Amino acid sequence: MHPKIILIHPPVSKPAEPPAGLAKLAGCLHANGIGHEIIDTNLEGLLYLITSPVPETGENDRWTARAGKHREENLSALRDGKIYQSRSRYQRAVADINRLISRAGKAYSIDLSLADYRDSRLTPVKSGDLLKAAETPQNNLFYPYFAPRLENALKENPEFIGFSLNYLSQALCTFAMIGFIRRRNPRQKIVLGGSLTTSWAKITGNKNVFGGLIDEIVAGAGEKRLLDLLGCQDGKIDTPPDYRSFPVHDYLSPVTILPFCTARGCYWRQCSFCPEKAEGSLYLPLSPARVLSQLQTLGGQMHPGLIHLVDNAVSPAILKTLTQNSPGVPWYGFTRITP
């Protein structure tokens, strides 16, 4: 069965765990019986660069040669907990992998690492540069990877292709891929969501400033709008995340890490730099009992080694519940310490 929608996680962000937002959308789509596919082009694209021959740049240094020789060994080590017993071995493995990625980026005037993407010619904070990235997808560092990958995706004839744009380090690659899709199929419906997209929408008053390139801008939680677009107006929205469409064993972590969000927005909302307050986002928490139940269910289904609570700040109520009632899986997150 052809998927009605293909959801894409674009490069570049840390490839340590599945993206929480797309996992939540996947859970909603699955609960409503809507065919979908998830493509983590961030993970796939970075692995493509790491395992590809190092571009010739006139520099033939020993570090790059060593990194290339041990690339598979280093990738395996980062997925095996043993290397984390030695800080120096871990640091060397990460440095060697970053060396290969950095050299690949240098050929395109890109400052690239496992966590960042900076183009010396284009900036993600200028709409004109984003449009330029869309107009010239062949100039993107990841083009040799995403061109055939997206060609195959288009052959599945999805009704929509959606991109989850959360960080500035993803913006130029997102628009390059959107531009490629527009070239191959001008009629393909494209949806753009994610936290960075939400911030832009608040600035522009929810106006689609990329009309003609992007069909739909989704600000905030995407479940309701996505179901409406897919003709499921009365579908289930409050559903747990679904990680079964993600290659959970391919991420660069010693154990499977599952991100989980216990609330939308932030319970504190008083930090001077808070985007939730600036954007007028509501605080919509799950009940502690529901959080515990969903975490226990996910633990039984996926057998993760770690749960990452991705809230801006984990609330005292959730902390109390999880310390008194173990979800069965180690967990961590960030919270506010109040004197």
PLM-predicted stretches and their roles:
Residues 29, 266, 291, 309:
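Conserved, mostly hydrophobic/aromatic
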Residues 252-289:
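Canonical Radical SAM [4Fe-4S] cluster-binding loop centered on the CxxxCxxC motif
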Residues 13-16, 45-46, 169-172, 198-200, ...:
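Flexible loop/turn segments at secondary-structure boundaries
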Residues 5-12, 187, 199, 292-339:
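Conserved SAM/AdoMet-binding glycine-rich loop
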Residues 8, 39, 164, 191-193, ...:
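A cross-family glycoside hydrolase active-site/sugar-binding cleft signature
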Residues 4, 12-56, 113-241:
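Glycine-rich beta-alpha loop elements in corrinoid/cobalamin-binding modules
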Residues 41-111:
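Non-catalytic, alpha-helical, charged scaffold/linker segments
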